[in-house]
Amino acid sequence: MRAVTFGELLLRLSPPGDERLLESPELHTCFGGAEANVAVALSHLGVRCDYVTRVPDNPLGDAGVEALRKEGVGTRWIARGGSGDRLGLYFVEPGADLRAMRVVYDRAGSAFARLDPHSIDWPAVLAGADWFHVSGITPALGEGPVAALAGAIACARARGTPVSLDLNHREALWRNRNPRPLIEPLARRAGVLIGNTGAVSAMLGLAADDASLATPERARGLAEQLSARFEAKRIALTRREILGPREHGWSAVLYDAETRAFAQSRRHRVHVVDRVGGGDSFAAALIARLLAGDRPAAALEFAVAASALKLTVPGDFSRASVEEVEELLRA
């Protein structure tokens, strides 16, 4: 099986431990980005995955490409920018007790934001692909990325390749712009929608909050509403319950419109080490198990367990293997 993801690669910088961003004498670095995180997680779950992006032709771009190669991700379709391009950055200040986690983006004018949508040969990229995954972050980054994304989804649909869209609402990237005019047309073309109630409300305009997933009946109602409005075959919604400063309840639901099957996962109580990448690892594991032919309920339980494991390790990438996830499921 082969999957393809498309989005921006970022360099993440974080202070160690619980230190504050501008009060620490050092910053730890790693690479990330929603779609890159999905590609890495898929690779570790045994799915061959190619990642499509654009990075600068400089040492930071070189390091990013090499980091992906080390994780087993295909980098053939990564374009290189000119000498004046830059790699997008983001800074993460871990939260502690009453202090919430803080994220600061520095990605305006990046090599990816300046992407020429006509520079990607999507028929060649998607030839032989069994799945195509994107996120709602890309449309916020500029006209080039959103045009490339629309062209990619159109190409995938024409080829009969399943498309998943993780809504991934990032308020700071939209800068008070309304995301709905860009996101809703993409959502109507994606066969699988992934997100949480906050993203559903902000990006698709449906009334949804934490209470929407509080009972199976409410969760199913929201999923059916999403499926009917956007003609999606599957709806996956994650739920994060804050039980303490670093204690979270983590669960999800999955609705299959073709069979009208609805599944609700068990709730994992997780001591969170790093919450970044949790949703991405959920998306990756769900894709991996649907590609493997699992029934929706089994695929959902696997995805929730895999993403719960990701919450226990630092950094953006999930390196959980199938065996590790299955061991957790047996526990």
Kindly label every feature range from the protein language model:
Residues F262-R330:
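Conserved post-catalytic alpha-helical subdomain immediately downstream of the catalytic base
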